[in-house]
């Protein structure tokens, strides 16, 4: 049998498979790594369903579970703090398999972050700041899917949309965050289509434009630790 397997690559050892959780059909995906590479997070099949995991060389792959209230599991880890002690992702709540963003710590386990008001219940965490205190992702809201920034002090706060992106079906999604949590990147509806953005508290959401030659579309996936370099994709004249 064969299946998708999470891996760790280093210059010394090349690509090394991380295995999978036990009990389910073999499948694992790595989606985040700590600052020094010692902690890897992702999701894998287990005996109860798809489950978020945290991997270390000492303890191998350990499932993080899900929200209580349902015998089955459907959770995934998407990001991890620099020291590997805080993991963020999405799980199924006891509210009828509705997705909720979570923040996991060794001390507190999985804690739900709620969602923005006004829409059907849904939220998803995609990235976390270096110290684990700021979480970003997307949530349903009264106006449509919307990127958010979460802290323990403020809770979940929507970041809005780019100018011209409010109608008829607005959306914005956050995908990356700088080390100190001050810069957030993602993509949003705009007057011409979908546009990558960079958000700061001072400037708000600022569109990054697109590559020339194709339909108007750009998407920011991640940002450097200092917030100055952003990567993603755009449609261009080459395809």
Q: Which residue ranges define each predicted feature?
A:
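Residue-level hotspots at or immediately adjacent to binding/recognition sites across diverse folds
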Residues: 1-239
